[in-house]
Amino acid sequence: DFSSKNDELTALSPSVQRGNIIRLTTAQALAGANTTVIFATGSIVGNALAPDKSLATLPITIFVIGMAMGILPTGAIARRYGRRTSFLVGTSCGVITGLLATLAVLMSSFWLYCLATFFGGAYTAVVLSFRFAAADGVEAAKKARALSFVMGGGVVAGIVGAHLVTYTMHLWSSYMFAATYLAQAAVAALSALVLMGIKLPMPTVEEATGGGRPLSLIIRQPLFITAVICGAVSYSLMNFLMTAAPLGMKMGGHSQESSNL
């Protein structure tokens, strides 16, 4: 219950709480780069590998589907085994994403690349929970500051991801972006190492057994419906702009470095 959760937080020393925020912020900057890499390269690689050019942006669609499908399992793992376990499962998906994408480029396999982006979406579903872990891992008075630090890590992630693509895309000269995806897998593994040292309260008995309001009740609330509509519209606009932009810029004569940024 709430009191037992509060007792666990009180038992965490200030240094442990600070360490949690540092680790989550660092992991956000590293793991969040996954999304930037996929959006920067997905439509371009898709266009190169697709049997039909009209399918060029399908890998990004699969990425979004993977993210949506990963949210509930991510929450279930965190509720049953703790957030740390959920994070490590997620970063494993990140490593798989990079390795499968590299193999897809080497084999010129469009559908394998789509599978890779699906795992990338599942990875992102876990990354989205870092901010909630930050709030769970500190006392109430420090929640706002903890959230701001972790969200700031997301800004760094955009820079890290763009530069990761720029500096690695030609390293494997015969296979553009193959080295990028290997680097992406390495960054996901590094993120896992960072998260292994995190210390967060374990789920209470009520949380682990699925206590709380049923989902059927939550989804009928006006505030929930409003939030879902706003999220769907805003994410649709973002995806509409970001999915085709890199490919459109390349076809318009801009450099790959420019589209990465």
Residue ranges of model-derived segments:
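Short amphipathic helix-loop junctions that connect adjacent transmembrane helices
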Residues: 40-53, 243-258
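Pair of pore-lining "gating" transmembrane helices in MFS-fold secondary transporters
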Residues: 14-47, 118, 220-241
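C-terminal membrane-cytosol helix-exit motif in multi-pass small-molecule transporters
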Residues: 161, 165-167, 185-206
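C-terminal ends and interior cores of transmembrane alpha-helices
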Residues: 92-107
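Juxtamembrane intracellular "pre-TM" segments in multi-pass secondary transporters
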Residues: 3-18, 198-229
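Cytoplasmic helix-loop-helix junction between adjacent transmembrane helices
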Residues: 114-153
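Helix-loop junctions at membrane interfaces in 12-TM secondary transporters
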Residues: 18, 103-115
